[in-house]
Amino acid sequence: FGSNPGGMLTRAVRKGDRYVLNGEKMWITNGSLADVCVVWAKTEDGVIRGFLVEKGTKGLKAWDLHGKWSLRASVTSGLAMTDCEIPAENILPKAEGLKGPLGCLTQARYGIGWGGVGAAMACYDTALQYAKTRTQFNNRPIASHQLVQDKLVWMITEISKGQLLALHVGRLKDRGRADFSQISMLKMNNVWMALETARKARDVLGANGIVDDYCIMRHMNNLESVYTYEGTHDIHRLIIGERITGIPAYF
């Protein structure tokens, strides 16, 4: 349900030893490929619970979304459940309320923080090598130009800061001390950093930056999606804002 998961419309109604699910989900990774789906739905008392729905269950329909300019190597699907009956034992026993799905998001956001570093490094390395070998104006490498060096320095500085942030949060996580707002900061900062790095790297390569001989446009297109999924950039700013002020500003 976008940035308002608490407003989800999918419902699960108890029927004897079974639950009946009705609703739709969009933008589900590998939804049409998965043998088992984890579906979050509101029960009759309005509490969000998690359910395991197996592929082939009557009433479950999955379809793929096409025409994407981003995440083209990933299968993205929609799911629809129409009077979809599953055994009551398929409920996740310890997942109750928003804590369940948001806990999953927190884990994913941590991984994305590192993924942003990897994408940024690929773009930086490409731009650096290109700048050192591409020559112009009396056969000089464009890396000798002040403005090109400025872009390269910006990239490696921001990447290094992102690496340190990811390492710090990772160490806190290993000790069980990582706060969800710190993980929001990691995801927010490192995806922004990676997207800006991709844009600057594309600029260094000029027209060559848009062709598939180089990885930059692929990373840039994918990062446009990562900027939004697992919590939008702006939502993460609000999460951090509430943490430091104690005042929620979502509405």
Protein language model annotation of sequence segments:
Residues 1-3, 27-30, 42, 68-75:
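Short Gly/Pro-enriched turn/cap motifs at secondary-structure boundaries
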Residues 14-19, 80, 104-251:
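Alpha-helical interface subdomain recognition
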Residues 77-103:
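A short, charged helix-loop
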